[in-house]
UniProtKB/Swiss-Prot annotation:
One of its GO terms (molecular function) is NADPH binding. Pathway: Isoprenoid biosynthesis; isopentenyl diphosphate biosynthesis via DXP pathway; isopentenyl diphosphate from 1-deoxy-D-xylulose 5-phosphate: step 1/6. It comes from Pseudomonas putida (strain ATCC 47054 / DSM 6125 / CFBP 8728 / NCIMB 11950 / KT2440). The keyword Oxidoreductase applies. One of its GO terms (biological process) is isopentenyl diphosphate biosynthetic process, methylerythritol 4-phosphate pathway involved in terpenoid biosynthetic process. It is an enzyme of class 1 (oxidoreductase). Catalyzes the NADPH-dependent rearrangement and reduction of 1-deoxy-D-xylulose-5-phosphate (DXP) to 2-C-methyl-D-erythritol 4-phosphate (MEP). Coiled coil: none annotated. The gene is dxr. This is 1-deoxy-D-xylulose 5-phosphate reductoisomerase. Signal peptide: none annotated. Keywords: Isoprene biosynthesis, Manganese, Metal-binding, NADP, Oxidoreductase.
Length: 400
């Protein structure tokens, strides 16, 4: 997508107050000649959104409700900030697709990020994709829209960005056509990699959220602890790189230094390494095909000294198996998996279920819900709702 190089690129950051959003703004602030924040959106952290608006002076801010909008407008006026406040999903879609926008960072967590991310794609934007649900829930629809509208899709997940960097430029011709044998998706194994399986019954939300290598929000931290995060990434990788699930192999790599690898038919294996800091993939995607300083410290190979690899233990991490099965089933199965997982993780964070019950609950919902095609966004949300209802029913049935 062409843009006037004499002015900074205008960036909409969907999910500006989350960890990806804040890292994006950090990179943007390092390059004021290249980038400026056009719109920032937030959900519950309105005070943080106010501070970001005062600092970055976007044209627009988006909040979820009229009440939040009234509050933010008053605070912005008091701070002498002229940022215009929009509200709700309509506001999100407006700033994602606005004619002035050059690139959209899609970093809203969960199903709430789906419509605005799709709006950016349908407007043919350069989309920096950090929202997992766009591909997990509606991969076929989403990738078809990317193709039809000529949007540029750049993955932000450190693993998918690593794969993207290790792929030849023409990988869209098909993996076998460009000599790719398989994709190796790395996983840290999370905080419970070596916890005895029987001890997982008693782990707390606090323990699950204490990731050894990455700083993340609570939901994704639990997903990392259960390895559902890696399962969702496997589904995403299949859509992003047009791969069948059997071509994507998960490798546990505790140091989180190698972010993923691509194995070629000639015996070459290309890997992308770096310190575990989301500013690297963000800077890579913002500047692609160029390179810019991200603020991340150079990798010290001598300090790392060693890199370890092991196969994932699917007895310890049944969520990984469930995600692979959903990827193989296709159609509505990944959307159902995702919805059931969201309800289960929330219940675990509220101490209503134990950690191993996350997988048990998801498996029962997957068994109950038939796999059907999802020809429209309405069908995607209908499958999502049915899975949430079945999940809540499971909680009621088990007295939670």
């Amino acid at each position: 997508m062409g843009c006037d190089v004499s002015r900074p690129q205008r960036i909409t950051v969907l999910g500006a107050t989350g960890s990806i959003g804040l890292s994006t703004l950090d990179v943007i602030a390092r390059h004021p000649d290249r980038y400026q924040a056009f719109a920032l959106t937030g959900y519950s952290r309105i005070d943080e959104l106010l501070a970001l608006c005062v600092r970055h002076r976007p044209a627009f801010a988006v909040v979820p409700s009229t009440e939040a909008a009234v509050r933010l407008r008053a605070s912005l006026a008091a701070a002498g900030c002229t940022t215009e406040v929009l509200e709700g999903e309509a506001g999100l879609c407006q700033v994602a697709s606005a004619a002035e926008v050059d690139a959209v960072m899609a970093a809203i967590v969960g199903a709430a990020g789906l419509r605005p991310t799709l709006a950016a794609v349908e407007a043919g934007k350069k989309v920096l994709l950090a929202n997992k649900e766009a591909l997990v829930m509606s991969g076929a629809l989403f990738m078809e829209a990317v193709r039809q509208k000529g949007a540029v899709l750049l993955p932000i997940d450190s693993e998918h960005n690593a794969i993207f960097q290790c792929m030849p430029g023409d990988y869209a011709r098909g993996l076998s056509a460009v000599g790719v044998r398989r994709i190796l998706l790395t996983a840290s194994g999370g905080p419970f990699r070596e916890t005895p399986v029987e001890a997982l019954l008693d782990v707390t939300p606090e323990q699950a959220c204490a990731h050894p290598n990455w700083s993340m929000g609570r939901k994704i931290s639990v997903d990392s602890a259960s390895m559902m995060n890696k399962g969702l990434e496997l589904i995403e990788a299949c859509w992003l790189f047009d791969a069948v699930p059997s071509k994507v192999e998960v490798v546990v790599h505790p140091q989180s230094v190698i972010h993923s690898l691509v194995d070629y038919v000639d015996g070459s294996v290309l890997a992308q390494l770096g310190n575990p800091d989301m500013r690297t993939p963000i800077a890579n995607a913002l500047a692609w095909p160029e390179r810019i300083d991200s603020g991340v410290a150079p990798l010290d190979l001598f300090a790392i000294a060693r890199l370890d690899f092991q196969a994932p233990d699917e007895q310890r991490f049944p969520c990984l198996r469930l995600a692979r099965q959903a990827a193989e089933a296709g159609n509505s199965a990944p959307a159902v998996l995702n919805a059931a997982n969201e309800v289960a993780v929330q219940a675990f964070l509220e101490r209503r279920i134990r950690f191993p019950e996350i997988a048990g609950m998801i498996e029962q919902v997957l068994d109950q819900e038939p796999v059907v095609p999802l020809p429209s966004l309405d069908a995607v949300f209908a499958a999502d709702q049915r899975a949430r209802e079945l999940s809540r029913e499971w909680l009621r049935r088990h007295g939670r």
